[in-house]
């Protein structure tokens, strides 16, 4: 929060560990401090994604009107250190979260096309409308995974994400450049969707 106070372009995302005592107070503090989302990566926190701790956080975030952010992975498995054994987030976990609360909004990062399609098409339209995806792990040309997702799901479901510092920020920008998107769709992905998501406290 101190860094955000010094830099007007920054927005805070508070990490919450729902397995620790007093996490509810941390959530209240984050909301009061103007955080745009709270984050919990169950694999790295040593928690089951479907366990009571994560489901309690999902419900609490929904009740507080603040989005919950989680990453499918943080880096390519081929480059991970042997001691980095945290499991990747699975599509079924995201579907369980979105069904655990009628008000929670989810931001899922580092998901590939298959993961996104499995969750999106396995959810009801109302559920899918409360999930946003960053594009950091979605292939662009020549495979055109991003183009296909935008054609089938619409630009409103996507956010610009780079995966920094473990991935290059230029890559997702190049993917958008190669697509020659309408100006409105590009603006939605690069900033409008995020601004709308951060600026409202309830669905």
Protein language model regions, located:
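Solvent-exposed polar/charged
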Residues: 5, 32, 99, 151-152, ...
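Short N-terminal helix/helix-N-cap motif within the alpha/beta-hydrolase-1
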Residues: 21, 116-117, 169-170
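Secondary-structure boundary/capping motif
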Residues: 22, 49, 141-142, 168
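Conserved hydrophobic residues forming the short capping helix/wall of the S-adenosyl-L-methionine
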Residues: 4, 123, 180
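Mid-to-C-terminal alpha-helical segments outside catalytic/metal-binding sites
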Residues: 28-29, 153-159, 167-203
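Active-site gating/metal-coordination segments in enzymes
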Residues: 1-76
């Amino acid at each position: 929060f101190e860094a955000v106070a010094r830099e007007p372009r920054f927005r805070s995302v508070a990490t919450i560990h729902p397995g620790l005592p007093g996490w509810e107070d941390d959530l209240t503090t984050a909301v009061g401090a103007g955080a745009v989302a709270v984050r919990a990566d169950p694999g790295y926190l040593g928690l089951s994604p479907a366990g009571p701790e994560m489901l309690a956080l999902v419900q609490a975030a929904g009740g507080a009107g603040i989005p919950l952010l989680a990453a499918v992975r943080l880096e390519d498995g081929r480059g991970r250190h042997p001691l980095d054994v945290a499991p990747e987030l699975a599509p079924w976990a995201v579907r369980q979260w979105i069904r655990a609360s009628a008000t929670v909004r989810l931001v899922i990062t580092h998901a590939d096309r298959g993961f996104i399609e499995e969750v999106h098409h396995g959810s009801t339209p109302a559920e899918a409308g409360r999930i946003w995806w960053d594009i950091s792990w979605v292939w662009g040309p020549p495979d055109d995974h991003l183009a296909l997702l935008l054609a089938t799901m619409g630009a409103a479901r996507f956010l610009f994400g780079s995966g920094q510092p473990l991935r290059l920020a230029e890559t997702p920008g190049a993917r958008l450049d190669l697509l020659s998107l309408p100006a409105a769709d590009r603006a939605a992905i690069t900033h409008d969707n995020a601004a709308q998501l951060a600026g409202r406290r309830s669905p």
